[in-house]
């Protein structure tokens, strides 16, 4: 997601965890890499269509966009506050924990399974969807699944996520 926001379209993501990597016989190393200092400077324009803010998410409660909460069930239910002032979830949001996108070895589920998973909470191709979690890390995983693996358009990350939303007194939570 971050790479796409800043215009880097040819980025790659490891499909699976390190145990799967090793099981497939790929090389690993215990050496610390030495990298040359970079002079790279971003000169483009960030793709703000991939980011939504608090106001946009708050308006979605009454609007047509789906809010996809990717946190744990305990966070969604308000049982685990993760240091936030308040717990719970945005009214009308749906829960698909980010971990549900992957098999036990960390590899992504087949596209047909992922489509079924999201259809079970009424998220389908063509929907406008805003993903969130606590700090927009897990939310980007689900953004990748919806945007890149399933090819859905209209998917954006609420960068402020729960750390912003649940620490304000003027936002609705259930």
At which residue positions do the language-model features occur?
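Structural recognition of the beta-strand scaffold that forms the well-ordered cores
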Residues: 12-13, 66-69, 95, 128-132, ...
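Thiolate-centered catalytic microenvironments shared by cysteine-dependent enzyme domains
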Residues: 1-51, 79, 138-155, 160-161
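Terminal peptide-recognition signature
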Residues: 3, 69, 93, 136, ...
């Amino acid at each position: 997601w971050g790479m796409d926001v800043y215009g880097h379209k040819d980025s790659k993501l490891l499909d699976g965890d390190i145990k799967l990597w090793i099981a497939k016989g790929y090389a690993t190393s215990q050496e610390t890499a030495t990298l040359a200092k970079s002079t790279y400077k971003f000169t483009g324009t960030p793709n703000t269509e991939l980011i939504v803010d608090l106001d946009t998410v708050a308006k979605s409660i009454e609007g047509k966009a789906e809010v996809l909460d990717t946190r744990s069930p305990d966070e969604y239910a308000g049982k685990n506050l993760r240091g936030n002032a308040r717990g719970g979830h945005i009214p009308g949001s749906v829960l698909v924990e980010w971990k549900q996108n992957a098999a036990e070895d960390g590899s992504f589920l087949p596209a047909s399974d992922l489509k079924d998973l999201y259809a079970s909470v009424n998220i389908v191709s063509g929907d406008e969807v805003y993903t969130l979690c606590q700090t927009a890390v897990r939310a980007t995983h689900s953004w990748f699944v919806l945007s890149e693996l399933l090819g859905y358009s209209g998917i954006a990350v609420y960068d402020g996520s729960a750390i912003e939303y649940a620490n304000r007194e003027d936002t609705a939570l259930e």
